[in-house]
């Protein structure tokens, strides 16, 4: 059986204790995983701290070369990494192989360029003073990454962190550790010096908690649940934070929308990545005049989605990450029905047509709950699974009010041909990201993050400087400006 250890200071470090990680589709044990704690975190942070001065002072061009080299190695290993990710998470292979793992490579290529554009600004004050700013690395960063798209999200954090001259300790979710281990190995193969990137495996309550609280950690980039994010900010002390937390993103479909494209995007936005995505459009508001027809067609198409073996290229919905998470999502479906929603597709039970080797897997059919009231728990709480809540609305004012009537504010989606309406809604909707007449299409230059309970801070492009860089001002006298003569 494969044994997953830690990567600390360039070495593969065995753990004192191990636990199993399982394939969500079959239930089989994939690997034994080292269970790190405070001792391993201390070693990793010490290694990162020792490596920081030399790495931070490495010429940007050289750091960029190493980032590109790591991106190239990922490109060369896409099939293997994708297969590993699918086995570890239950995500369909066509999504890991064609989208998520290649995106990870792009992260390193992109930030290799960004790190060479770390230009400050100058502020002359008449002919007396010259101020200029320096963009400098923070130091040791804690990167805490989730289980839903682990490799892509890990590289989304590692790439800007290292490219900007920081060193890091990466802590992946204990539910999806395999590709993070591979990332640590590839980083060393790319020539990134020992100690610059350390990977510690283990549980969030032990390894994760020790990492974010460590006094030598200067910045924390966390992606995960809102409750955990709040706890980190309460206990970890005075650090820089980027918190990408939960979401309950609204989709507003107006009667003048391109209905075919809106249907395509709404289905994709909630059901891709098994519905386990923070930007999922899980509350779909449809204007009353088109509500019956839209709901009917949405449910028909949801019923036709292919659920099954994640390794089959034709599968669209794979297995949820764990049995515990399956119980949570299934429980929300039952709750929605109890609250009065109409079940039009899917349901809380496992599919009955699975082959024998998948019957122990965490499979759930894409579920459509119609006639949902926005006050229901299924409309207010993050389910994080393939469950779409469909709600009618009367007009623009009501649509906006309902969209904002939730504690989260990560992504939002607007479907209309009315440009004036788009401009009003984009300004007034409470979300960090607004997508108009499109699904979630990312550009690595754009800021990613949310408002309200969806987090704080932004990452992406130059916005990653917020957490991974410090701005220093230097003020130089250019002449004989007056200085007060005290004590003369």
Report each predicted region and the residues it spans.
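Long amphipathic alpha-helix in the N-terminal Rossmann-like dinucleotide-binding domain
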Residues: 46, 68-79, 93-118
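ALDH superfamily catalytic-core signature
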Residues: 227-373, 436, 483-484
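Conserved C-terminal structural/oligomerization subdomain of aldehyde/semialdehyde dehydrogenase
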Residues: 26-32, 217, 252, 306, ...
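A short hydrophobic/small-residue beta-strand
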Residues: 167-169, 343, 433
